Amino acid sequence: MVSKELSKEQRQKRIQDIIARESISTQGELVQRLRADNIQVTQATISRDINELRLVRLPIGKGRHRYALAQMTGHTDVEEELGRLFQNFVHDVDRGENMLVIRTADGHATGVALLLDRLRRDDIVGTLAGEDTIFVVARTTLEAESLMEEFHALMLG
């Protein structure tokens, strides 16, 4: 069989279609799924696509997760989901001056950071997420203190 040559937009649309219909837990599974459709991709390409599409990993039980599109419509939806994620997956929040570090369960930092970004708060300059750590830059030291209190409250529910 001949592999299909897709544009980036076509490939990303195909990824969205797959994760909307199927439970895909890892980048490797997504690579295999695309290859089953004769779409040749590398895991590095899939990693970039996941970031650009702002996919999040949602828990599906028994320690497993699946990729999903973050489909928050309103500010309240984002706040509710952020609270749920903080209660379930955030382990620690620490602060130094106007910077905060949020430690999460493996694989959940990106989803939490995405929701923080979607709030578009004036007191948050920006976020940077890895696998289990989020770096949050607050506008001022005072705002960082306030954010830390707010994040601790979210952790407690």
Curated annotation (Swiss-Prot):
It holds the Pfam family Arg_repressor. InterPro entries: Arg_repress (IPR001669), Arg_repress_C (IPR020899), Arg_repress_C_sf (IPR036251), Arg_repress_DNA-bd (IPR020900), WH-like_DNA-bd_sf (IPR036388), WH_DNA-bd_sf (IPR036390). Gene3D superfamilies: 3.30.1360.40, Winged helix-like DNA-binding domain superfamily/Winged helix DNA-binding domain. GO terms for biological process: L-arginine biosynthetic process; protein complex oligomerization; regulation of arginine biosynthetic process. GO terms for molecular function: arginine binding; DNA binding; DNA-binding transcription factor activity. Pathway: Amino-acid biosynthesis; L-arginine biosynthesis [regulation]. Keywords: Amino-acid biosynthesis, Arginine biosynthesis, Cytoplasm, DNA-binding, Repressor, Transcription, Transcription regulation. The keyword Phosphoprotein does not apply. It is found in: Cytoplasm. Coiled coil: none annotated. The keyword Cell division does not apply. Its main location: cytoplasm. One of its GO terms (cellular component) is cytoplasm. HAMAP family: Arg_repressor. Belongs to the ArgR family. Regulates arginine biosynthesis genes. This is Arginine repressor. It comes from Deinococcus deserti (strain DSM 17065 / CIP 109153 / LMG 22923 / VCD115).
